[in-house]
Structures are given as structure tokens and as C-alpha cells.
């Protein structure tokens, strides 16, 4: 396939606490440089984590942005070819150059429902850290899927199939959703629903992790809450929207158990 999912980014109100969460629960490791960039004092990045395949950026949330999932990204065999395909078949797509000094830079585009996507050339000179290397590592706990909401899932699925050459996994598609894959990771397109404000919203919805043992993860989450309460997962079943939110995330066809990270990002766990 031409495209591989290699990147996901979160706006965080506490990068250090969230990094501890992902390191402790999922065994993710830093694979880009940590610390403030000397050449750019405004760059407060603490480095990016990885599961060996996909990098996770925890970016300090600036004014005007909401905490939570912000964008994801593809590494491409031929950036020029994909760019021309987008311009020809989806001429209304917004393009802009990726920010200087970030680890996964190239172009920023939007899909038909407004989801922000970074696209970068494999082996490109602007890739840094683990993104610049072909080899990664295998680990039992890793990012399994990224979920997007759309009013018309079939049309959005067509976009990802046509532009990025993802293929449908029919056995994992269901309940109005469509599951696509790059051969390793999954992109799940869920239908919008009218039973809550959140389920009506198009765009990034949640992420999913594959784990080897759900009960072991639950115990580790309990221990994390005792040892580092600031890095503990957020409760889903709280407030007047809690039950609706729990029911919504539980309805994901790829998940078995749902949690939320310290910033409230919803995470589906599956074995």
C-alpha cells in the first residue's frame, strides 16, 4: 500500500501526566528528542511516544484549542502522487505546509468531514527521530484503530480508499460503520447519531489499543491511580451525559472495554 498510518496527535493540558499514562499502561516509549528545542524557545514539546509503529504527539494546548484528539498522519511512498490525486479528485481540499521543527512534517490537509491529516514522504529530510527510520519494534500493546465520525460513512470511506489506497475489512465493518486498513492498523468510520451532541459531531472520535489481557490492564490502571493520581484515567460515567457517552463508546464494533486518558480522550481496548 502507498500509505501507512504513522502519527496521531493530542492537545494536552498536562503533557507529563499524559505521557506517564501512555508509558505505564501501554508501554509506549519516546522515539523523538525530549526537551525544549534550543533553536525555538516556543517549542515546548516533550518528545513523541511510539508503540513501535505509530508515533503519539502530546502537544501543550494553546489558547483557542480544545484538549483532545487533534489530527493523525500518513507516511507515503509517493507524496507527490497522492497530492496530485487529491487535487484532481477532491479539489476543495485545504492544503498547508507542515510546521517547521516538528518531528512529522510535510503537508497538512483536511478530509471531506474536516479531519486534519498530516501527510509526509517516507524517508523525507523533514522527518525526525523514529519517523526517519524504517525499523520500529513489536510490542503486545499498541495502537489498533483510529475512529472518525461521519454523516455519510460510505462517502468518507471512498475518500480514504481512493486517496490512500486503504482496503475495507468487511468482517470488522458493521452497524453502519466501515472499517479500513493499511495492512497493519485500522481506520474505523462510524456513523453520526442524533442521541447526543457528541455523536452528532463529524471528525475524530476515539482511538483504540490492542492489549494482551484486559484484566491485567485494569489492575495496572488501579495501581496507576494510587501511585500517580494525576495520571489516572478520567471517569466516563460521570455527570448527566455519562451514561450516554458510555453507551456510545461501548457500541464501537472494534472495542471491548472503554477508558479515557487524563485529558479525556476516549480509548477502546481490545484483545
Where are these regions (language model features)?
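Short, charged/polar, Gly/Pro-enriched secondary-structure boundary elements
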Residues: 53-57, 66, 114-117, 184-188, ...
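Short beta-strand/turn micro-motifs at beta-sheet edges
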Residues: 59-61, 130-135, 193-197
